């Protein structure tokens, strides 16, 4: 423990402003006054309760909807019984404008709620076994689990009972409400497929095998932009998982940093002390010498969104329903619950990708179920651009949002569905976050979109930072920056260019994640960005015949200097009709030839484009471009 104490002592003794607020009272004191607030109205609520304490119970004051609240509802394991789904749906209809958001923590959020109705809403939820405790601020957030945990054929261990044990250790326990330095995200899964964004959590228990024994490897320190690292710990059973979890949360409570609010997640404690020292502290605190890590068994790619149904261990089916951007309603939730109750066991499961599974559907009645009215609005199988899309709240509902986000994600998916059709076996994960907080887990998307502001003709406009190459397989991997500050109105045209490549070159049943690994990773990201920008410009200016094409096996192997010359050579030949030089060696010209002026052949070509291409193949090596960054910003948007 010495390393942890030394790390804590090395930090500033001055706590952050939120810690000062937390010292004013206990959260239970604020919650006890909820009935009083409901009688006296919004203006009777103290500022600290609106800004912090009520959030400990999922009650969020939302400036975007003055004097109205968002309620974040904890859906344990993302699982809703028929009675629970009907209750949430009815409450949304009665009190919340019939609006529901499905979230990336497998929960629901109700909006447009008045404080006057809040006690009634909470009582009704409690009557069906639903809590909103600890769904905000410095608390234990909903534990993520596979939405098909224990049911899918790739589920080796049913971790549901373990997840419930972990939740019982803190949920609605005053001694664990608002005592952490920062929020704490947990995930556990006994499945071989990563359906729960398992590696992006503060604490993750991942299916593993050691010497023929099934259990869980422990990963720690995940957050936005960072994948959790292996703690080199193997946990053999539910007792060991619970022991380790209690040790971890106690250590984080006692030694976590409370000075800089931006650097007090578990990740920063681990960075300070080293994960090896933290793992030793876990063993000491738990008084258990846990085994070292086994083999990570998360090796299967999920496929059910593409098939619309998945066969379960009990020979029934889980039927998928696509909810674009997670925008749902109380009426729709009730309709889904009723349909599932008639055709299945009435249970619904919310996925991390903001979609819904109906459980317990017998094979003989899947087709009749799909004829129900709910599937007219929410498709069983949508296009590959919709099946796996994620989008957080955005400017309409979130004070941190920079772009609208949810409608942007839908608009792009709709555009791409029409422009670049993909077969149902394709899989493209487009994850959208409206700001840098990353609630739409954009870093893990095949394409990630992060809202920002940018300039177009000197005017401020909505924009996105675009990343590529996020991975769910193996131990997951954050995507890499591709394009910065792209005007939102043009982003779809750039993505379209890589979708054309994917549609043309992909193999049967090949996801974009696998395609990126097989083809695109051998190009530098700078070259891909240039490819997207230049092709979009050429197509939108009636010069489609000049566009670049990518090779399945690029000869340049990601070496940017070579890529610049090779792309320039191809563009020149496409425009002029002949090679710029008669001979080449190592992606450079031989001889003293001087390429022709592009505008002498194509008078309509933009002067910037002509200069860019010439610079890429310039006969003077000292004037020839060697990196794309000096070229891409000179390309007009379209």
Where do the language-model regions lie?
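Small-residue-enriched alpha-helical segments and adjacent helix-cap loops
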Residues: 42-47, 68-213, 323-459
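Short glycine-/aliphatic-rich beta-strand segments at the starts of folded cytosolic domains
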Residues: 57-78, 309-326
